[in-house]
Regions:
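Beta-strand elements of well-folded, non-transmembrane domains
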Residues: 67, 133-137, 170-172, 233, ...
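A cross-kingdom marker for long, charged
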Residues: 214-253
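Intrinsically disordered, low-complexity segments enriched in Gly and acidic/Ser/Thr residues
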Residues: 169-223
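Short, hydrophobic/proline-enriched secondary-structure or compact coil segments at domain edges
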Residues: 57-65, 69, 124-132, 240-247
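Soluble, non-membrane globular domain cores that form compact, hydrophobic packing
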Residues: 4-46, 143-160, 179-195, 231-233, ...
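N-terminal leader/presequence regions that precede the main folded/catalytic core
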Residues: 1-107
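Extracytoplasmic beta-rich ectodomain segments of secreted or membrane-anchored proteins
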Residues: 80-176
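Extracytoplasmic/periplasmic, Sec-exported soluble proteins
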Residues: 67-74, 137, 141, 175-179, ...
Length: 253
């Protein structure tokens, strides 16, 4: 996967699908499957964020996976059942991109939750549940929801994986490259990481890493990427925006 700045929501959706495909390859080729709901990796991301970026932080976590009909429920019934098991309101039905979609937008303990279930075919659907928070209390609540939602997806027969992106700013006018060096120094103090891919332009530096201690990963060529870091200079404010993704970034940076 090329490591570059995602431009726009449509591309972000494509990236999410590519992440899921990479997860499928990675999980299928593991002798022991990675944990589907390892809260320690999310706490590791928060710890890194507290060290390398200034507050406020924005954290986005996405669960995503496939559902296949088993003859007992149609997609609408299954979407309603999953929404109830997540303690969310009933789904709203709409058509998006020519596909029936069932959606819920809600807030849980200050965490913004977006539930999206889209029918791909008569007996197959694709689900993305996104949680977003900022601030210490909300970040703690999101960590709990991440684990709860992973368990609920599993109990509803959906083999899902999660990814997370943390975003914050670094004050002061510094080139993206020097900010990236400072961020990397913080990462290397906590874990062994090997740079595997890199992208750079006039205002952005993005690196992807192999991190053996992290169990979540995505296949990219002959490598398994476990973490992506991007630094983007905001020329209007003079500060730099830092985004850290496990295993890769799936929001615009």
């Amino acid at each position: 996967m090329a490591v570059r700045r995602w431009a726009g929501l449509g591309l972000a959706v494509c990236v999410a699908a590519l992440v899921w495909m990479g997860y499928l390859w990675y999980s299928a080729n593991q002798t022991s499957a990675p944990s589907h709901q390892d809260p320690e990796e999310l706490r590791t991301l928060l710890k890194l964020g507290n060290e390398v970026v200034d507050v406020p932080q924005r954290l986005v976590v996405k669960w995503q996976g496939d559902w296949e009909a088993n003859g007992n429920q149609d997609a609408y019934e299954a979407a309603e059942g999953l929404s109830r098991s997540l303690n969310l309101p009933g789904v709203q039905q709409l058509t998006e991109g020519g596909h029936l979609t069932y959606r819920v937008v809600d807030t849980k303990n200050g965490v913004n939750v977006r539930f999206n279930w889209q029918e791909i075919s008569e007996d197959r659907s694709y689900i993305i549940i996104q949680m977003e928070a900022a601030g210490d209390e909300q970040l703690s609540a999101l960590t709990e929801l991440q684990s709860e939602y992973g368990q609920a997806l599993h109990e509803n027969g959906i083999d899902a994986e999660w990814n997370a992106s943390l975003q914050g700013t670094v004050k002061g006018e510094h080139p993206a490259g020097s900010t990236m060096k400072a961020v990397e120094d913080g990462i290397f103090r906590h874990m062994a990481a090997t740079k595997a891919e890199t992208y750079e332009d006039a205002t952005t530096v993005s690196n992807a890493y192999e991190v053996p201690s992290l169990r979540s990963g995505i296949q990219s060529g002959g490598k398994v990427l476990n973490m992506q870091v991007a630094v983007h200079e905001d020329q209007s404010t003079g500060s730099s925006r830092v985004t850290i993704g496990l295993p890769v970034i799936t929001i615009e940076y």
